[in-house]
Amino acid sequence: MPGKQFPLKEYIAALAKFLDTIEYQDDNFSHEQRVESLRYVYQHTAKHFDQPIEKAAVTVSPKRLQAVMRTSTLVTVYCWVKCPLDVMVGVSIYFAYIIMLDDSSDTPTTEMKTFCEDLIKGRPQKHLFWQRMNAHLTNFLRYYDGFCAITIFRSTLDFFQGCWIEQNNFGGFPGSSYFPHFLRRLNGLGGISSATLFPRSEFDEGTVFEEIVTAIAQIEPQLTLCNDLISFYKEYDSPRDQINLVSNLAHCNGVSWEIAFEELTRDTILYCEQLVTVFKGKDPKVEATVRAFVHGYVTWHLCDPRFRMQEVYEQAGQSEADLKFRHFYEQATSIGVIDFKLWASPSRLSSDKRKHEQAFGDDPQNGKTRVLESIGQANASEAVALAPLA
């Protein structure tokens, strides 16, 4: 909505109510645990993309790849708190591929003509994304039982189609009231983000099947709505971000952006309330996993500079809602803002890797039970968006 004054008062009130609803308090890690987890996941993500076959396939610049890996590492460590480290690495690699797909601008019509036939007959895919993603999923899905694995693959297909639609810069026809939600569900990655929380090493899918299915159902809308609410400030006056849920709701339903924003706020709080209450009295490990994910997801948003939350914080006044938002923001940044040099500095990579090998050898179980003394390869300053969190 370029040219119009941003509704700061209403926006801060919505954020404060949202954060209050989920009772935001990220106690997932100590500072040392967070830094060490970032080091481990980043270093192993970088190791994956340093393989010759990946180097040949990646089309982005080295600087861009470093930024992509930093982002995938951050969101994974902050949100997949209860997962073993080897699972975190798999999630981080997955999101790196997703970010690079989201960066692309070429419509995949030609390469996708035989996608279904190739998939059914087990032939190699023609699209580069699917070649590399399928190779990764072949290993990554081994961490999961059947229902979660299918959900992860289905969510990947959905995201690809969502990108395909957005590459055509299409936000829906007027009168197509469900289209904005349809598109947001496709590109929201809610399925992958929820199903990957439940690896078979931590959960028996058969025992907590109902809880897992409910988590997938509830996290899908909550994930995207939370992102859309927090992103509203940065997208408000950005010409390149005008194809978003609020603008699509206004366009398709023939209403003002104010009404569309009210709908976004109402739905965000509704689904957050449900997510907070629905697991009470259910399996405690599932409840703790979902809670850790939701609170870590908020921390990542509040601390990532690209969402410009510091600007909102600096403009906040002294009303009850403003003070509440300021409190939550200060709480998040006190734990979530960490200098990249502490975990993604190239100067420390070799020495830390040697320390890790001397301390733990190559036993993979150590990687699941203790954060290893290792660190990433890059400290690029380039910002990057993660599609479902953009």
Curated annotation (Swiss-Prot):
**Known catalysed reaction(s)?**
(2E,6E)-farnesyl diphosphate = (1R,4R,5S)-acoradiene + diphosphate
Query: Binding of Mg(2+) 1: at which residues?
Result: D102, E166
Q: Which residues form a coiled coil?
A: none
The cross-references to Gene3D superfamilies, in alphabetical order and at most eight, read: Farnesyl Diphosphate Synthase (1.10.600.10)
EC numbers listed for it are 4.2.3.-
Identify the cofactor(s).
Answer: Mg(2+)
Domain description: The conserved active-site motif D(D/E)XX(D/E) is required for coordinating the divalent metal ions that stabilize the PPI moiety of the substrate.
Which protein are we looking at?
Answer: Terpene cyclase flvE
